[in-house]
Amino acid sequence: MMFIYVVALVSAVAFTDAFPTGAPVSACFDMIPGHGTDPKPPPAPYTIGAVANSVKAGKSVEVVISGKTPEDTMLGILLEARQGDKIVGTWNVAPDDDFAQLLDCGAPGNAVTHKHVPNKQPKQTVSYVWNAPADGEGDVTFLVTIVKKYDTFWVKVSSAPIQIVHAH
């Protein structure tokens, strides 16, 4: 009887790690959703990029994620800015955003993920504002995991790097 209880508990925990309420903190480093299936191989049918190729330290830049065709929509994301393996900066997400919310991946608001909305409609394009660290410098790459549907997702889709420059 105890074995059945343990199996049920483990199954429930595994299932709850793949909620539609956003990526769990456990996905912050590897950016792999707990969906029990392998990611799709690159190239992904999505693009990610900043609207500028540089940003001043302490300032902001918009980052846009888009499907390449109208059929390339998103139900979920996990978005981060990285220098190497380090997550840097913070994000702005409007409180009334119907798709995303902030996630704390080791620091407040340093990642963006989807949120639960009843009858959520897939998005073809989303954009969020990234705030460069005030003491930042060097190249930053934006990485996003995109979920088209539960068993169809791409991990760490990468932008071209942008440079953080010191404000004078």
UniProtKB/Swiss-Prot annotation:
UniProtKB keywords: Antibiotic, Antimicrobial, Disulfide bond, Immunity, Innate immunity, Secreted, Signal
Record's GO cellular component terms: extracellular region; membrane
Cellular localization per UniProt: Secreted
Disulfide bonds: C28-C105
Residue ranges constituting the Reelin domain according to the UniProt record: 19-168
Signal peptide boundaries: 1-18
Key word Secreted present: yes
Main localization (coarse): secreted
GO BP annotations listed: defense response to bacterium; defense response to protozoan; innate immune response
Family to which this protein belongs: Belongs to the insect defense protein family.
Protein role: May have antimicrobial activity.
Protein name: Putative defense protein 1
Lineage, highest ranks first: Eukaryota, Metazoa, Ecdysozoa, Arthropoda, Hexapoda
